[in-house]
């Protein structure tokens, strides 16, 4: 599995690269933290099944970003992220 961590807003060139790589990948999970949670307000998230998207609830609340149906808004966001990162079968990419 490929794990993507996005901390940039949707129009940032790094975000665009992240979404491009996700489109070309299979078996992926997307973690949204910091300004990355603004991606929940864009259509770009249609590239993944919503249950494969994890958002930091604390960052969403701090920025006033509502959660989309099906997206995992996690209180234990960083714990889940670290568990996925530490699994030796997973590749990790940070943007």
Label each residue range with its predicted role.
Residues 10-30:
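Histidine-anchored nucleotide/phosphate-binding helix
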Residues 2, 27-28, 53:
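Hydrophobic anchor at the start of a short beta-strand
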Residues 65-95:
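C-terminal structural segments of small proteins and small subunits
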Residues 19, 41-45:
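Short, T/G/N/S-enriched strand-turn elements that build extracellular solenoid repeat scaffolds
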Residues 45-70:
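A glycine-rich helix N-cap at a beta->alpha junction
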Residues 25, 50-51, 88-90:
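Short, well-ordered alpha-helix to beta-strand connector turns
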Residues 2-15, 34:
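Short, glycine-rich nucleotide/cofactor-binding loops
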Residues 34-38, 58-60:
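Short beta-alpha junction loops
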């Amino acid at each position: 599995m490929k794990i993507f961590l996005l901390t940039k807003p949707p129009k940032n060139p790094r975000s665009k690269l992240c979404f491009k790589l996700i489109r070309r990948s299979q078996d992926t999970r997307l973690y949204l933290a910091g300004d990355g949670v603004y991606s929940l307000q864009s259509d770009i998230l249609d590239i993944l099944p919503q249950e494969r998207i994890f958002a930091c609830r604390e960052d969403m609340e701090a920025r006033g970003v509502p959660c989309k149906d099906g997206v995992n808004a996690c209180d234990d966001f960083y714990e889940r992220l670290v568990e996925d990162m530490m699994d030796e079968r997973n590749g990790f990419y940070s943007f």
